[in-house]
UniProtKB/Swiss-Prot annotation:
Keywords, sorted A to Z: Cell inner membrane, Cell membrane, Membrane, Transmembrane, Transmembrane helix, Transport
Transmembrane spans: 12-32, 42-62, 66-86, 92-112, 114-134, 151-171, 368-388, 405-425, 429-449, 454-470, 481-501
Domain of life: Bacteria
Name the UniProt record assigns to this protein: p-hydroxybenzoic acid efflux pump subunit AaeB
Subcellular location: Cell inner membrane
Function comment: Forms an efflux pump with AaeA. Could function as a metabolic relief valve, allowing to eliminate certain compounds when they accumulate to high levels in the cell.
Entry's family note: Belongs to the aromatic acid exporter ArAE (TC 2.A.85) family.
GO terms under cellular component: plasma membrane
GO molecular function: transmembrane transporter activity
Protein source organism: Dickeya zeae (strain Ech586) (Dickeya dadantii (strain Ech586))
HAMAP family hit by this protein: AaeB
One GO term (biological process): carboxylic acid transport
One Pfam family in the UniProt entry: FUSC
Broad class of the protein's primary localization: membrane
Length: 650
């Protein structure tokens, strides 16, 4: 009953209503000039994570979002003060700098991690809000900035209190369940790779495992928002995910080995891998039996299968620690310290630049429209332009996000009119009636937000934004209509800019991602022990996950990326002699691979040079009397790059 979907939806709806009503009551009690901002902040902070999660958000999500909003607001206020002090004598230049500032903030938000992007997006449009709304009274800019920060902090505190009051859910149980299911999925992938599977079935299986592993990483971030007592579990999960990437890679490589040597896995191990195992307990029992058999027949087994079993053993050890959250043991500490993940740099630099240009152009057009028409509510249009372009650009589908805002503002027009003309005037003698009316509206919209109904989140924010909710309340019908229509026009302009300034960087992003895989394979060639310990798998699979999302259905790119990841893992285990000549050549190849990633016009030239260096490197290995296994592995990578030269270098 308590964990039923219906109960959770009702609980969040009560939580959202409580946050909005509490912020409004405290705003009036503290004599704030515009308690609307506190209510609007509480609504956005509480409803935003619920819309993303599609239900009641887990513990820590609202608190984390609130802290990001505080930081972004303070950055935006400081930016507004600096711009106004610097350009107080040139209002047109002031607005131009605001537009540029908003574009730069959106550009930065498109490059940083998704969970931190909200800070910079908010900083961009907060500066614009402060400057635009203070144009009539520029001498009150400092007072307005302080009041804005106070109202936002009040709204955030109310959202957090409401979240704590209605018992937020912990994501820990979901993580434990997902970790067990992931191990079962990994074992099924190994079974199918050993027993034979078509390419199409293999693509579907490893695609699902990549998404499940990435989802657990997202859950880990939410767990860290919940409490600091999960730091040990978070460290274990990070290394556990590395073992998951290793298992996916080694299982797929085992399949390739069996294609060349069909009898590489035989006897009792082959028979055991044919036996079904559906539950976590069955998989743990099978793995224990496989390790015993592998210990007795390790020399006759493919190295990739032995490596897979080792990764599975490490996975089980870490999964036990994640579930119990006990103090990190010595054996676990060795695993955690040995894992040195390489951070993945953004492959969407051009996409980020387009997002920044869209925001700058949209806000600039809004400024021109405002100055040209002299519209009294042009500031509302400007604010909506900045909000839509700042928040929509970081999402996978900015166009759909802009449509959501537009539908929300259209719904807010009749809903807000009903509240403004009938409900609010009838509640002027009773704060209780005012709270009940707004709480009822928030309750209904809160249920729709959890269903991710198109326009629900935009309707909630837009309705609160156009209502009076000031101290004292003033019912000016013409101003209400101006504000409501200004919101709609702002969303239409933002949608038009997104449609007109098209993002044609998808193909460039695709080649950048694929060449990142090439660089990962080349960087595995090293004679330095410290560099060989660097773990590129999390970064490579993060790029693969982005590739899956940006180019759904393009199987050829997925297979090429996975092949390069397998080459990276194979080359990383090669034993190369310590030689200044080899070390210098490794640095030269890495530099060329980096040039392939960064170049646009001369990519084909740099890629041809990399292929020539790979051919020369094989001869260099023969001169140093390196094992045939290492030379063959480098030859496979070279042949793979030659086969896909058009996709990687043109």
């Amino acid at each position: 009953m308590i964990n039923s979907p219906a109960f959770l939806r009702l609980r969040f709806a009560f939580k959202l209503s409580t946050a909005i009503v509490l912020s409004l009551v405290l705003g009036f009690h503290l004599q704030l000039e515009t308690p609307r901002w506190a209510a609007l902040t509480a609504a956005i902070v509480a409803a935003g994570p619920a819309f993303v999660a599609g239900g009641d958000p887990f513990s820590g999500a609202i608190r984390h979002r609130g802290m990001l909003r505080v930081i972004g607001t303070f950055i935006g206020c400081i930016g507004a003060l600096v711009i106004i002090i610097s350009t107080v004598r040139a209002p047109a230049l002031m607005l131009l700098l605001c537009c540029l500032w908003a574009g730069v903030c959106v550009w930065i938000s498109s490059l940083v991690k998704v969970e931190n992007a909200y800070v910079f997006a908010l900083a961009g449009y907060t500066t614009l809000i402060i400057i635009v709304t203070s144009q009539s009274e520029p001498l009150r800019i400092l007072q307005f900035a302080v009041e804005r920060c106070s109202e936002i902090v009040l709204g955030i505190v109310c959202a957090i209190l409401a979240d704590l009051l209605f018992s937020p859910r912990s994501i820990k149980q979901e993580i434990d369940r997902a970790v067990e299911e992931l191990l079962v999925g990994q074992y099924h992938l190994l079974q199918r790779c050993v027993n034979g599977i078509s390419k199409e079935e293999l693509d579907a299986v490893w695609n699902g495992l990549v998404r499940k592993t990435h989802a657990i990483n997202g859950m880990r971030s939410v767990l860290m928002m919940e409490s600091s007592r999960w730091q040990g579990a978070s460290r274990r999960i990070t290394t556990l995910l590395t073992q998951s990437w290793v298992m996916i890679t080694q299982a797929c490589e085992t399949r390739l080995t069996l294609q060349d040597h069909p009898n590489a896995v035989k006897g009792a191990i082959a028979v055991m891998l044919e036996q079904p195992a559906e539950t976590p307990a069955d998989v743990q029992r099978r793995l224990r039996q496989l390790r015993h058999l592998a210990a007795a027949h390790s020399r006759s087994l493919p190295p990739t299968l032995v490596s897979w079993l080792g990764a599975a053993a490490r996975y089980q050890l870490l999964a036990k620690g994640v579930k119990t959250n006990v103090r990190i043991s010595q054996s676990e500490a060795v695993l955690l310290d040995a894992d040195i993940p390489v951070k993945a740099s953004s492959a969407e630099t051009h996409h980020a630049m387009i997002n920044g240009v869209r925001t700058t152009v949209a806000t600039g057009l809004g400024c021109l429209f405002w100055l040209w028409t002299g519209w009294t509510s042009g500031s509302v249009c400007m604010v909506m332009l900045a909000v839509v372009t700042s928040l929509a650009m970081r999402l996978p589908n900015p166009l759909m996000a802009a449509k959501d805002f537009l539908i929300g503002t259209l719904v807010a027009l009749p809903l807000g009119a009903l509240m403004f003309m009938l409900v609010l005037p009838s509640t002027q003698q009773s704060l209780l009636l005012l709270c009940l009316s707004l709480g009822g509206v928030a309750f209904v919209i809160g249920i729709e937000v959890q269903k991710r109904r198109l326009g629900s989140l935009g309707a909630l924010a837009s309705t609160i934004n156009i209502l009076v909710l000031s101290n004292p309340m003033k019912f000016n019908l013409s101003q209400f209509l101006d504000n409501a229509i200004g919101q709609v026009i702002g969303c239409i302009l933002a949608l038009s800019v997104i449609l007109l300034i098209r993002d044609n960087t998808r193909e460039q992003t695709s080649r950048t991602l694929l060449n990142r895989f090439v660089f990962g394979a080349v960087s595995a060639l090293s004679t330095r022990p410290a560099q060989r310990q660097e773990n590129h798998l999390p970064a490579l699979y993060q790029h693969l996950f982005l590739l899956l999302n940006l180019f759904p259905g393009e199987i050829g790119k997925y297979r090429l990326a996975l092949s390069l990841i397998m080459m990276h893992q194979r080359l990383r285990t090669l034993v190369l002699p310590v030689s200044p000549t080899l070390s210098a050549f490794h640095r030269q190849m890495r530099a060329t691979a980096e040039q392939v990633i960064g170049s646009t016009r001369d990519r084909s030239l740099h890629f041809s040079r990399l292929l020539a260096q790979m051919d020369e490197y094989q001869q260099l290995l023969r001169d140093h009397q390196v094992s045939d296994e290492a030379i063959d592995a480098v030859g496979r990578l070279t042949a793979l790059l030659h086969r896909h030269q058009h996709a990687l270098g043109d």
